[in-house]
A protein has these predicted regions:
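Amphipathic, small/basic residue-rich leader segments at the start of a protein or domain
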Residues: 1-123, 147, 578-596
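Glycine-rich cofactor-pocket loops
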Residues: 28-31, 61-73, 284-299, 313-352, ...
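Acidic, low-complexity proline/glycine-rich segments
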Residues: 1-24, 274-283, 314, 320-321, ...
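C-terminal amphipathic alpha-helical interaction region
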Residues: 98, 456, 472-596
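Alpha-helix capping/hinge segments and adjacent helical runs
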Residues: 181, 258, 364, 386-464, ...
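A short core secondary-structure module
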Residues: 186-244
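Internal maturation/activation junctions in enzymes
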Residues: 77, 128-129, 140-182, 366-385, ...
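A glycine-rich, basic-preceded beta-loop-alpha segment at the flavin cofactor/substrate interface
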Residues: 195-197, 235-250, 255, 262-296, ...
Length: 596
């Protein structure tokens, strides 16, 4: 199936909700306003629709392959990757001083959504490279930045993130890979890393692995982990590639989805030690890796949004073609396309509402990141960075849970045909399943939301956002119509529910952590439901204000916002009850280990 990027919807969010014109007033972004965004998004849509989308099914049916340590990408991926990097897409949001485009994250984010929607397996490669670039720009030496970043931006080299080991999944305190210092300032790295996305492939000349390992006599646990650059090929003084480093791919995984993305098992040091270069200071590796991880977590949230939109497009197209049964209201005597049936409309409306809400929240988060990095006032930068950091686990956790629901509904709209691989709906369902797992499971995102993002600041950011929601509720009260009334009622209830849960977390987080963390995922889901609902409410307000300019488009925005209010926001009260009303989640903690 073809992919038609929803550029008009994206531009609506950029202008009306995320504030592209405000971002364009930041130092260095003066030329990156609405017109620039429109031009970039149009080109991205063309590339993703014409080049990447046709390869999506091919990658699923003819995935990357491994033989004797060599990984060969799906046919067509290499040529597509060359077009991608030659078009400057890898460097879209990276600094011009390293040959990037220097555009705001706010403009890059819709392009990333398109990449994910058109071909998720392909999009994973530039995602990890983006993370490597961010980590090196933040923690690398000037020499490391000059040596690696331009090549990563140009796409001549790609990047990876090496955390996981057979015994160390989410618990990085268990990392055993070791790095032994040499007399020349380098280290020899030894160990096994698993689940390394695009850890070996033939699409680029070199691969820059960022590897967590322990130096001799390092402290126990996460405080004794350091970060190292380990290139696949050594780099000569003149920048040319030298001998193969002692890192080898011993296998790739056979997966439920994202089959074209090679998930590698990498062995370091089987032949004397892989040469590595310390990033920053010893024992601060996890701190530096979190730079990469936070970039990746936001990116995975965008994967959820992209795949959700693709699943929605597929389901809507099928519903307009599939003829089954007469309408229940008797308006026709013959069978009609299934989009005429109320429950199909409910499923499609829910899919679209969830996707548009998640998209809006993610784009707004991207704008906060841009302001945090570029605003001239330090206090403003700090405030927007805090908001962005609060939103990241919600964007990652909520969007990736959401896409599992949306992709499942997409299969359901297809009926029995959705269970057949040839129709394509099943691929989105399979591809989506990993998104709530990798780069930190939903529970890890929820724990972050509770611990670092709510308890640590006394709920300051959460309460500030809830106050802003109150302003939106007040604005809704000035509008006529059923949609505004419904949204006002549900958003007001949702804000009260979120406020209640934040207060509960603050009151019980230290004295009864088991109870609070048993409700952490419902808290994250509640935050997602309410914060996305807030953005849908703002979309409704903007649609009312602009309705005369494009009645059909803005009426659809109003209707989808009402759908969100009545089918998604209504869940807020139940989520609150499952946390606050569950008496410390006694039922969750009641069974003994043997009773499970």
């Amino acid at each position: 199936m073809s992919y038609n990027a929803p550029v008009k919807d994206m531009l609506f969010v950029l202008k009306e909700l995320a504030g592209i014109d405000t971002v364009a007033q930041l130092p260095g972004f003066e030329e990156a306003g609405y017109d620039t965004a429109q031009a970039v998004l149009d080109e991205s849509a063309k590339f993703c629709g014409e080049v990447l989308a046709p390869l999506n099914v091919e990658g699923d049916r003819n995935p990357s392959s491994w033989k004797d340590g060599v990984v060969t990408a799906t046919p067509g991926f290499g040529a597509a990757f060359r077009q991608f990097v030659e078009g400057g897409w890898q460097g879209l949001q990276h600094p011009t001083e390293y040959d990037g485009q220097g555009l705001p994250k706010l403009i890059a984010t819709p392009c990333i959504e398109m990449l994910n929607a058109s071909n998720l397996s392909f999009a994973l490669c530039p995602l990890l490279t983006d993370g490597a670039i961010e980590a090196l720009l933040t923690a690398g030496t000037d020499e490391q930045k000059q040596r690696y970043v331009p090549k990563l931006i140009s796409g001549e080299w790609t990047g990876t993130m090496n955390l996981t080991e057979p015994q160390a999944g989410s618990d990085l305190a268990q990392v055993r890979s070791r790095a032994e210092p040499q007399g020349d300032g380098t280290y020899k790295v030894f160990g096994t890393k698993i689940f390394i996305t695009w850890g070996e492939h033939d699409m680029a000349d070199n691969i820059v692995h960022l590897v967590l390992a322990r130096t001799p006599n390092a402290p126990e646990g996460v405080k004794g982990i350091s970060l190292f650059i380990v290139p696949k090929f050594m780099i000569n003084d003149d920048g040319s590639l030298g001998a193969r480093n002692d890192v080898h791919c011993v296998s790739i995984e056979h997966k439920l989805g994202i089959k074209a993305s090679p998930t590698a098992v990498l062995q370091y040091g089987d032949h004397g030690g892989a040469i590595g270069y310390l990033v920053g200071e010893e024992n601060r590796g996890l701190e530096y890796m979190f730079i990469m991880m936070n970039a990746a977590r936001f990116g995975v949230g965008m994967q959820g949004i992209g795949v959700a939109d693709r699943a929605y497009q597929k389901a809507a197209a099928f519903a307009k073609e599939r003829v089954q049964s007469r309408p229940v209201d008797g308006s026709a005597k013959q069978s009609v396309t299934i989009i005429h049936h109320p429950d199909v409309r409910r499923m499609l409306g829910t899919m679209r509402a969830l996707t548009e809400g998640a998209r809006a929240l993610a784009y707004v988060a991207a704008a906060h990141s841009d302001i945090a990095h570029r605003h001239s006032d330090e206090a403003t930068r700090v405030r927007h960075q805090a908001i962005y950091e609060y939103l990241v686990p919600v964007v990652k956790g909520w969007s990736t849970e959401m896409v599992n629901d949306v992709a499942s509904l997409g299969v359901q709209v297809h009926g029995g045909m959705g269970f057949i691989e040839e129709t394509g709906a099943a691929q989105y369902y399979r591809d989506a399943r990993i998104l709530a797992i990798y780069e930190g499971t939903t529970a890890i995102q929820a724990n972050d939301l509770v611990g670092r993002k709510t308890l640590r600041d006394g709920g300051a950011v959460a309460k500030a956002l809830i106050a802003e929601i109150g302003d939106t509720v007040a604005a809704l009260g000035k509008l006529d119509g059923a949609a505004a009334a419904s949204m006002k009622a549900q958003l007001e209830m949702g804000a009260r529910a979120l406020s209640s849960v934040v207060d509960y977390v603050l009151a019980n987080g230290k004295q009864d952590p088991n109870a609070v963390f048993a409700g952490s995922v419902p808290y994250l889901k509640l935050a997602g439901v309410v914060l996305c609902g807030w953005q849908m409410a703002r979309a409704l307000l903007a649609a009312h204000a602009n309705r005369a300019h494009d009645t059909a488009f803005y009426d659809a925005k109003i209707a989808i916002a009402q759908c969100y209010a009545e089918h998604v926001l209504v869940q807020a009260g139940a989520l609150e009850a499952s946390i606050v009303g569950a008496k410390g989640n006694e039922s969750v903690l009641a069974l003994t280990e043997d009773q499970f």
